[in-house]
Amino acid sequence: MNVIKFPAREDWAKIVERPHLDVSELNQTVSAVLNVVRQRGDEAVKGYELKFDHVDLNDLSVTQKEMDEAEQQVSNELKEAIRLAHHNIKVFHESQRFTGKKVETQPGVTCWQKAVAIEKVGLYIPGGTAPLFSTVLMLATPARIAGCREIVLCTPPGRDGKVNPAILMAARIAGVSQIFKIGGVQAIGAMAYGTESVPKVYKIFGPGNQYVMAAKQQVSLHEVAIDMPAGPSEVCVVADDSCNAEFVAADLLSQAEHGIDSQVFLITTSNKVIDDVQEAVSRQLNLLPRKEIAQKTLENSTLVLVNDLNEAIDLSNAYAPEHLILQTENYMELAEQVVNAGSVFLGQYACESAGDYASGTNHTLPTHGYATTYSGVNLDSYQRKVTFQHLTAEGVSNIGRAVELMAEAEQLDAHKNAMTVRLNSLK
């Protein structure tokens, strides 16, 4: 773990910089796969499933029988955990329902908005070393609340042609419409373009590796919307002497086990915290089954010693982390200063894992510094706002001349005339 003490502000940009990868070759590969999927549909998807996921599929769809079998394979204890998480996610996202009100901007001029669901959405759920069934809940639950008519899910099958049963169980609980055994770039292409089996969707959500992220970016240029650009997962912990070093170490490791490209960042006002956390990390690391992955992540992690907590928050805002944990004595006060973060965890008991699974907030969050401009997934992600305006004769009288003058100044005579004929009708 790299320790930096009292860095000058002019050096912060270098400290918070994410690694940049040359993706030119990767983008060419992704583009080629997408083009074949666009042209050949199911045939191409099945071919890529055989090539990349090593499974020969006759049917891309998950059947009702497979759903029922999966439910039997998931323990009752895990089912209850999934239901609890789903309940909390549902409660939190239902609280985000839009309640538009009519506003009279001038007498006779009334404006308002209406929230309208995106009709068809696609969810990508990674498989691999950690099948993320929790992400099914995070993406499908708000889609269902928003009123999306069709919720399509793609996830890679195992070599036996089966989808992880917990993913299917979560999909059933959250109300997914259709599930397909497709992974990687071919899944993104199938949802973006549509195939004989997979319906074309209007917006694609979900995490994935560099190939999946590149595919989402490419299809978003022409075909569909996406939730957000994304990079490797990351956490920043701000801690002072009041923190529990064991808790901080556990939080850093929970992020480090995601993958070797994950980012781990600790900002503290105490030398002792740095020493205690490093010792606790070393001890806890040896207990992890994914020790090797976490170890490689930690080699690129950063521990920063700063002068005070105000400086710590300034540095965190410059970093704009996906996850921000405040383990300080005055965490509520500090929270008011946070402006750039995907999701914030307050106090020693609010571990990142709580938000990852069951507190109710969404864990699909902006990474790679995008928290400066993007929100995490929320109910608005699945809706559009349609604006309405109604003018009476009085309204035309009140704003008509202003419209004429502005249209004339922009040299848009037809725009001016559309109002002029109405004004003349009132004379």
Question: Where do the protein language model's features map onto the residues?
Answer:
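N-terminal Rossmann-like NAD(P)+-binding subdomain of aldehyde/semialdehyde dehydrogenases
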Residues: 1-119
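C-terminal core of ALDH-fold dehydrogenases
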Residues: 318-427
